[in-house]
Amino acid sequence: MNLRVLTVADLHQSGSHYRWLLDEVQAKRPDVVAFVGDVLNDPRTSQSDRVGTEDAAELLSNLPCPQLVFVRGNHEQEDWPKFVAAWPLHERPLVALSGAVHIVGPLVIVGFPCHTGWEEPWYETLPKVGNEIINDISLSGRKVLSADYEFWLSPLIRRFGPAASTLWLMHEPPQVREIARPYACNPRWTKAVERFRPLLTVSGHDHHTPMQYNTWHGELGATVCLNVGRGVMSLHYCVLDFEFPESKPCLPTRITVEAFPWKSQVVIQPK
């Protein structure tokens, strides 16, 4: 069984980036579009081509793709509830992952939390869209997900087995020199990758490293780590083509990753 996932991050409510994404989704025909944080932008930020929050929800909810998956970035803050309210939940689900998984046939997608920025609005909306918070804790009166991955990631790995080490989505990248500067990385996620050794991680957050060094991937041990952070004059994204031996959750036999606009590939063949 084959599945195609298009991964993108850091659209920041840019009208031009939304339009470019629509064109690419129409051309690539993915089964899933995975938004790896910062589809919205801080409303206090000046931006010439900013799309309104309600318009952003309308544009993204109408993408011609069977499934859309979101993880939080540091800019999903006070406008996120407005985005959710404008989303046509009766027509298509809004899958918002935070320390949880989403299963598409044989593919198990793990969505990491993002604790940078004001995260409470995100957590407040999760019950409204039918997504659960795994092992949430009370911290100074706030309901949040623990920053310690032992509270939520380890139970997911135990529950779903090796299939849960296929694709991890995390806005803040692990510490991989080729895809992000050290201050943009999350050392906790680095430790999680080193411990559980997933096949593939996809991040954003650092917009500059891919453009400055013309790189989009690196390795942390046996794990291939991608940065699909924002381009300026074009859309940066990756298409992931998975080949699975069966239709129930399992590890793929092959993953072909193609990065755009570079049009270069990496092939992952699990041992």
Task: List the predicted regions and their residue ranges.
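Beta-strand-turn-beta hairpins that frame and shape the catalytic cleft
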Residues: 1-6, 101-111, 164-167, 216-225, ...
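Conserved beta-sheet core of the metallophosphoesterase superfamily
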Residues: 61, 67-69, 178-245
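Core catalytic region of metal-dependent phosphoesterases/phosphodiesterases
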Residues: 15-104, 228
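Acidic/histidine-rich helix-loop elements
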Residues: 6-13, 40-51, 121-141
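Active-site-proximal segments of metal-dependent phosphoesterases and phosphodiesterases across multiple
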Residues: 40, 45-53, 160-197
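Active-site neighborhood of phospho(di)ester-bond hydrolases with catalytic His/Asp-centered motifs
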Residues: 7-10, 33-38, 67-74, 95-99, ...
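Active-site-proximal loop/helix segment associated with metal-binding centers of metalloenzymes
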Residues: 107-177
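A short C-terminal boundary segment appended to hydrolase-like catalytic domains
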Residues: 181, 245-271
